Design a protein with these regions (language model features):
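Conserved beta-strand positions in the central sheet of alpha/beta enzyme cores
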Residues: 38, 65, 102, 144, ...
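Conserved H-loop
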Residues: 62, 142, 234
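N-terminal pre-domain/capping segments
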Residues: 1-98, 171
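Active-site acidic/histidine proton-transfer and metal-coordination neighborhood
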Residues: 19, 58, 77-175
C-alpha cells in the first residue's frame, strides 16, 4: 500500500477558480506538505492550464482533477450537455497532463425527478459513461465516479450502485471514487465497499461526518484503512473539508 496524499482546493478556496485563489491554494497545499492538489474544475473550464501546471511544478505538487455536474447537465434530463461538459473537462485535464478525472459524474447535485431511478435513466447513464470513457482513452485518463448521499442525488448513492453500472459499461478506465462523508450516510460499512471495489478504487475524499477535523466525528477510519491495506491501495487519499473561515465557502456549499 503506497497511496498519494493530497488535498482539494476546497480546503482553502471556494469552488469558483480565479488565478489569485488558485495560486493561493497551490501555495497552501505545498506549505502543508501535501503531495497532490485536486483541482475542482469550474463548469466554464476557464483557467490557463499551462500557467497552473507551471505553478504546481514550482511548488512540488502533483495534480488531479474533479468535476461535479451542474443542474443543467443532469444526465437523465440533458445527456448531450453532460457528455459535452465531461469531454471538456477531460480536455482540460489533458492540458494539465493528469491521468485522473473524478467527481459527481452521474447527475446534477440536488436534482430530483420526484420518482425512483428508472431503467431508462440507468441505460442513459451507461451510454454517457461509455462514450466519455472511450473519449478519455485518447489521453490516458481514468474516470472516477463518486456516489453521493440520497439528499443530493437519486442516481448513484452507494458504491454498489456505481460498481454495478461500471460493470455494465465494461470500460477499463472507469473507476470508483469514494467520499467518507457520503459513505457515513449511505454505507453500512467502511470496509466492505473498499473490498468490493478492489482495483477499481482509485480515489477517496477523506472527510469527517460533519465535514470537520478528521477523527472527531463518526467515520470509522480503522475499518476504512483495514480495507485499503487488504486491497493494497495505491491511489489518492485527498482531504476535502469545508471551513467557514474560507470567504464565500458557506454560500458556495
Amino acid at each position: 500500500m503506497n497511496p498519494t496524499f493530497g488535498a482539494s482546493i476546497l480546503s482553502w478556496i471556494p469552488p469558483m477558480w480565479t488565478p489569485e485563489a488558485g495560486l493561493f491554494a497551490i501555495q497552501q497545499a505545498s506549505a502543508a506538505g501535501f503531495d497532490l492538489l485536486e483541482i475542482l474544475l469550474p463548469p466554464s473550464m476557464e483557467f490557463d492550464a499551462p500557467t497552473v501546471k507551471r505553478q504546481l511544478k514550482q511548488h512540488g505538487l502533483k495534480e488531479t482533477c474533479s468535476l461535479n455536474l451542474p443542474k443543467e447537465a443532469h444526465i437523465p434530463f440533458y445527456p448531450k450537455k453532460a457528455t459535452c461538459l465531461i469531454k471538456e473537462a477531460l480536455d482540460k485535464a489533458s492540458e494539465l497532463e493528469v491521468d485522473y478525472l473524478g467527481g459527481v459524474l452521474h447527475s446534477g447535485i440536488g436534482v430530483f425527478s420526484g420518482k425512483q431511478r428508472t431503467r431508462e435513466e440507468e441505460n442513459m447513464l451507461c451510454e454517457v459513461w461509455a462514450e466519455v470513457a472511450e473519449y478519455a482513452t485518447r489521453s490516458g485518463i481514468t474516470i472516477g465516479i463518486e456516489p453521493i448521499n440520497r439528499y443530493e442525488s437519486y442516481m448513484c448513492t452507494s458504491a454498489e450502485e456505481v460498481l454495478r453500472f461500471i460493470k455494465c459499461v465494461n470500460a477499463p478506465n472507469l473507476s470508483l471514487h469514494l467520499d467518507t462523508f457520503h459513505m457515513n450516510i449511505e454505507e453500512t460499512s467502511f470496509y466492505e465497499p473498499v473490498i468490493a471495489a478492489g482495483s477499481r478504487l482509485r480515489h477517496i475524499h477523506m472527510t469527517e461526518s460533519d465535514r470537520g477535523m478528521l477523527g472527531e466525528g463518526n467515520v470509522r477510519w480503522d475499518d476504512l484503512f483495514r480495507g485499503l491495506q487488504e486491497i493494497d491501495f495505491n491511489g489518492n487519499l485527498v482531504l476535502e473539508n469545508f471551513s467557514n473561515s474560507v470567504p464565500g465557502m458557506a454560500e458556495a456549499v
